[in-house]
Amino acid sequence: MKNFLKNTLFLLFLTLIIINRPKVTYAILEGIKLWKNSVFPSVFPLMILSDFALSTSIINVISNTIGKPFSKIFKLSKQSSYVFLLSTLSGSPTNAKYIKDLLSHQYIEKKEAEKLLAMTYLYNPILILNISSFLPVKIGIYLIVTNILINIIIGIINRNNKINYTPIIKLEPQKFSLVESINKALNVSMLILGSIITFIALISLIPIKHPLISGIFEITNGITSLKSYDFTLKYNLIFISIMLSFGGLSIITQIKSIFINDKLNYSLFYKSRIIHLILFILISLIYLKCFL
């Protein structure tokens, strides 16, 4: 039965793609353009910097500087503070890459990776400013700050989820290879491109056109499409809050692909997205009422 459904869905999508080939082709080209202009420039350099950071003492510096209060507040190991700090700059799915690096080198365990993933669902600040450029700059700054704040709140809410870890006083720097780092960064970048193209192509086949529906599949496309509609600032902010909370199937697929061999439990991650959604909408409504 399962195979029958898979085959039926495959034939259905294949038929739709053939029938709507010009529309799908246009959507794919738009996806490539979006990735080239907004995603790749903000993600690729930071992934290489992340690899380079593992070859230096920067993780130890960060862990020794903010690791102790971070560990006490969130009940995570000190080295997890490095992931949170870098995630505020690079966002998702790069946060998964940082967590994967620590997990692969056995600096953290699987349970801690799950807990850390739930509270680092952030976005590259430059990317947010780019895709929300049709709105006032203060809205973009509000979105960046609020999203970081909500992830901190989620970390506090989840702090009592017990994990076992051995505190590491000093992490040994890893050997850095620029060629290997570029190769890994390109692989993740291509994964992101493939996800964006796939979901934007699927969106083009859906007869109902609405930014929220687009955002459910692919967030950057969903937010940028808002400028084509005559929504008020209030509705734009609420719609963006919803999309940033969920992140879109594209980003979730990318994150799961990075951890494909680690068999993480995503229940805490999904629960945290619901909390994220509720908090983001409530804070946005308060912000609209008090400041706009």
Where are the model-predicted features located?
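Transmembrane helical segments that form the transport core of multi-pass membrane transport proteins
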Residues: 56-58, 178, 182-244, 248
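Selected transmembrane alpha-helices and immediately adjacent juxtamembrane segments
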Residues: 8-23, 28-40, 44-48, 52, ...
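Membrane-core helix-loop-helix motifs of multi-pass transport proteins
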Residues: 102-157, 258-283
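Short, amphipathic, aromatic/basic-enriched membrane-interface segments that mark the entry/exit
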Residues: 14-17, 51-55, 110-119, 212
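Alpha-helical membrane segments and immediately flanking helix-loop junctions
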Residues: 70-133, 215-227, 235-260
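N-terminal membrane topogenic signal
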Residues: 1-9
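Juxtamembrane boundary at the C-terminal end of a transmembrane helix
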Residues: 282-292
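Hydrophobic alpha-helical transmembrane segments
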Residues: 62, 84-85, 116, 140-141, ...
